Amino acid sequence: MYQRPQNDYLRVNKRKSNYDQLNADSNSVPQLAQTQPRVQVYIIDKNDFKSLVQQLTSPQPCDRLPQNIPKHQDIRPEPINWTSSIPPSAMAVQEDPDVSLYMAYLQSLLEESSGSNGDQFEEPFDKYHSHMMAQSQPQDPTQSMPQSNGFEPFPSSWFNGSTQEMHGASSLQSTRVDYEYPLPLTPNFTFSSMTQHEVFGSDLDSIGPDEDLEFSYEIN
């Protein structure tokens, strides 16, 4: 009969299982890693890495960019305070000599033109004023017209003024004469022979009592 040896139960341990093989492989990996040489690792900044790459790739060495770049700021100018009361346009005119000379020339022309016009119209205006003052005063029509050859003065408002005033007024401008001395409506006056028989004398005895006389006159 076959008898088992005494240590037969130990035969199971002689054969290793798969689990044991995996554990054995895991233990052998760190041993291999320890045997390899360690690689040197450098920790650098991103900007330093960029500059390093540029230096290595560029044909010429480039300067390193500044780290602190100043930020853009809006600089506003100070408000302008005008010390004088003259506006800017007037100050610019005063500073420009050409403009100031031209303005002085224009002002002198205006003064000369105003002075010449005043001298021309001063004398006619004085005559006109004196004539109007003379007309405003009441005068006797019998004194203004002197009697000549026994003729009586005509009772008309046309001869209220003196002959000297009429000649002086005729020297004025034509436009003023039209307003100062209005012409009569009709240049002819009709007088009855009965009313003017004593005035004209015995020369009109040959004219009948029913006939009329017409007299025309002109003003020079």
From Swiss-Prot:
What's an example GO cellular component term for this entry?
nucleus
Subcellular location, record wording: Nucleus
Motif VQ per record, residues: 49-57
Which superkingdom?
Eukaryota
For the region Disordered, give the residue spans: 61-80, 131-171
Which portions of the chain have biased composition (kind: Polar residues)? 133-150, 157-171
Q: Does the keyword Magnesium apply?
A: no
Q: Which GO terms describe its biological process?
A: defense response
Which keywords annotate this record? Nucleus, Plant defense
What the protein does comes down to:
May function as negative regulator of plant defense.
Miscellaneous comment: Plants over-expressing VQ5 display enhanced disease symptoms after infection by the necrotrophic fungal pathogen B.cinerea.
What protein is this chain from? VQ motif-containing protein 5
Natural source organism: Arabidopsis thaliana (Mouse-ear cress)
Upper lineage is:
Eukaryota, Viridiplantae, Streptophyta, Embryophyta, Tracheophyta
The gene that this protein is the product of is: VQ5
